[in-house]
Amino acid sequence: MIYQIIHSVLSTVGVSLNAFMMYLALTKSPKIMRPCSAIITIKTGTDILASIMSFFVMQRVITDGSSIIVIPTGPCTNFGKTACYVGHMLMLCFLEYNLIWMISSYIFRYYILYVRDPPIKHLVFVAFCLSIPSMVHMAAWFSFYDSNETTEDLSSYGIGSGEMALGGEVVYWSAITLITQLFITAFLVVVAYIWIRETLCSFAVKMGSVKKDVKNLNKRLVKVINFQVFLPSFIFLGVITFASMFTSKISYEYAQYAISVIFMFSPICSPFSYILFVPHYRNVIIGKKKQPKPHPEMCGPIRSNTRTTSISVTNNSSHLSSAH
């Protein structure tokens, strides 16, 4: 019962924070931040779905290396084993897609800085294309799952005959596959973070002291990605907990509850990377309506005014010559 309450609270907080962040991105972003708002909206949408699936299943995971047992305790139990297995797989799928989108957002930031603003329809199209492999992968596992497959005797784990439990070869290999993919994708996020951080720093060095606002922009970007790189640590910790239980390094009594709870902190903490370090959103929250001095937004392209200034000076000189 306590575990279900904790899960309900975490899922509610995850949905609420990400829904609020989505609201800010959709309604409080200036025109220059439209690409950024689209990136944030897609990410928060994925976090919301992950939180909903976590609440739907409220799973515990037990393994001794030879088998993996998923014990759902959420609303999915009212719809049968197949619904719980689908919810279990979708939760892991959304967590993985969230990490993939983080990598994509780093690439988009590079593109925005050095090339131009990508159209929003292109961002949506890329997000859709990135989801196709995961959806095909999930559909394959769903087709293999047999809800009538018998599980081993679970009395040694303190699980009564009346409790729903998901087990068997499909559950075993699908869990192993997805958890391994989560670990690899989280590692790739760290690699992408190192790359984009070096890119932002080198961009600031190239600009030198010509544009002070550019330095402020890059400082904000670095703060955002410094916070975001902390998010995969929850995935790492959850996977390490699972691996430790899988290899019998730790007992299942507490580890079975820890894995899903640890995973949930990734979507919960994600909105704070924007709320804390993007001035426009932060000012909306604290009720600050005006900025004393305009600054370029963190996701907008850097525009140089040098050419415009030179044209204006040339035109003015021409008018003066005509007057004389």
From Swiss-Prot:
InterPro entries named in the record? 7TM_GPCR_serpentine_rcpt_Srd, Nematode_rcpt-like_delta
Give the membrane topology, semicolon-separated if more than one: Multi-pass membrane protein
Which residue windows does the record flag with biased composition (Polar residues)? 303-324
Keyword entries, A-Z: Membrane, Transmembrane, Transmembrane helix
**Region Disordered: start and end of each range?**
290-324
Write down the Gene3D superfamilies for this protein, in alphabetical order. Answer: Rhodopsin 7-helix transmembrane proteins (1.20.1070.10)
Cellular compartment(s): Membrane
* TM ranges: 5-25, 38-58, 83-103, 124-144, 176-196, 227-247, 258-278
Q: Which GO terms describe its cellular component?
A: membrane
Which coarse location class applies to the principal site listed for this UniProt protein? membrane
Q: Which family does it belong to?
A: Belongs to the nematode receptor-like protein srd family.
UniProt-recorded name of the protein: Serpentine receptor class delta-30
